[in-house]
Regions:
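Beta-strand/loop nucleic-acid-binding surfaces
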Residues: 130-138
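Basic, glycine/proline-rich low-complexity segments that contact nucleic acids
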Residues: 29-117, 137-297
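Structural recognition of beta-strand segments within beta-rich domains
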Residues: 116, 124-126
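Aromatic (phenylalanine/tyrosine) cluster motif
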Residues: 9, 19, 24-29
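Glycine-centered tight beta-turn/hairpin loop motif at sheet-sheet or coil-to-beta transitions
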Residues: 126-129, 207-209
Length: 297
């Protein structure tokens, strides 16, 4: 009788795992590439993602606001970031990155598309309070989300690094105690907690392989950021890039000598020197930061 109960229990566990895998595959299928009939060259190159499981229209006024793009200009009106301008008009969704606030808890009502970032966002609601947070991969509707030192070790919950097991995948990591999450917020990214040092620091490995030390009292959210297939997108045409507020980038060799170090020459030229920026700095392969600076100051 005991053996039969064990067999039944194990079979139920196996079935539950199978159902979870099927559910995960179904959700991933809903978010895979969108097939476009290749009538034109641009459509033939295009590779987009389906958003069948996402809510596109969001009408909570207190969590949205209009904003004027800077288009790469500073407060003096001078261009500090090139190749920015145009783009479709958007409403900004006010995301709550300060998960150290223990009052942030509730049920996930919607998974939303956000045109202002690569990741999806989640609408959290409890009684009369509601928030928008970054949606981790695998977050489900009606799942309970909590930010607390005593929160369960579940995807979407936020805890201090002190209370997160070593080896866990995390995102939205704050750099200082009582501050908003700054690291690991793009689609499909995650960091790994690999060590706790002297009961004071946590060593984390970022997506790039870089190691950082942050205080154990800093908060992080469990899981990988949603929309993991974002990197497979192919825009297909220049117009779609313009919709995203990106302007064309002119090659240096196509310019005049006064405008770029690679410019000028009679006919087509290769530039005549290693690739550099318009200001003469090497662009390919030159390190631009210190690798061994572990501590975030």
């Amino acid at each position: 009788m005991v053996n039969e109960c064990k067999i039944l229990f194990e079979s139920e566990i196996v079935l539950l795992k199978i159902y979870n895998i099927i559910d995960f595959i179904y959700i991933q299928y809903k978010m895979i590439e969108k097939k476009i009939n290749p009538i034109t060259p641009s459509q033939r190159q295009t590779l987009l993602l389906k958003r069948g499981t996402l809510t596109r229209v969001f009408k909570v006024k207190s969590l949205t606001k209009g904003f004027q793009r800077s288009n790469g200009r500073n407060n003096q009106g001078r261009i500090t970031v090139r190749h920015r301008g145009g783009g479709h008009k958007r409403l900004y969704r006010i995301i709550n990155f300060d998960r150290f606030n223990n009052n942030i808890e509730g049920f996930t009502k919607k998974i939303l598309y956000d045109p202002n970032r690569s990741a999806n966002i989640a609408y959290i609601e409890k009684s009369s309070k509601y928030y928008l947070i970054l949606a981790p991969d695998g977050l489900k509707i009606n799942q309970y989300i909590k930010s607390s030192p005593n929160a369960d070790l579940k995807i979407g919950n936020a805890l201090p690094l002190r209370n997160i097991p070593i080896g866990s995948l995390i995102h939205n990591i704050s750099l200082y105690p009582q501050s908003k999450g700054k690291l690991i917020r793009s689609a499909g990214t995650s960091a790994q907690l690999i060590q706790k040092i002297d009961d004071k620091y946590a060593k984390i490995r970022l997506n790039s392989g870089e190691l950082k030390l942050v205080l154990l009292t800093c908060y992080a959210t469990l899981g990988v950021v949603s929309n993991v297939n974002h990197k497979t997108i192919k825009l297909g045409k220049a117009g779609r890039s313009r919709w995203l507020n990106r302007r064309p980038s002119v090659r240096g060799v196509a310019k005049n000598p006064v405008d770029h170090p690679h410019g000028g020459g009679e006919g087509k030229t290769s530039g005549g020197r290693p690739s550099v920026t318009p200001w003469g700095k090497i662009t390919k392969g030159k390190p631009t930061r210190k690798k061994k600076k572990l501590l975030i100051q």
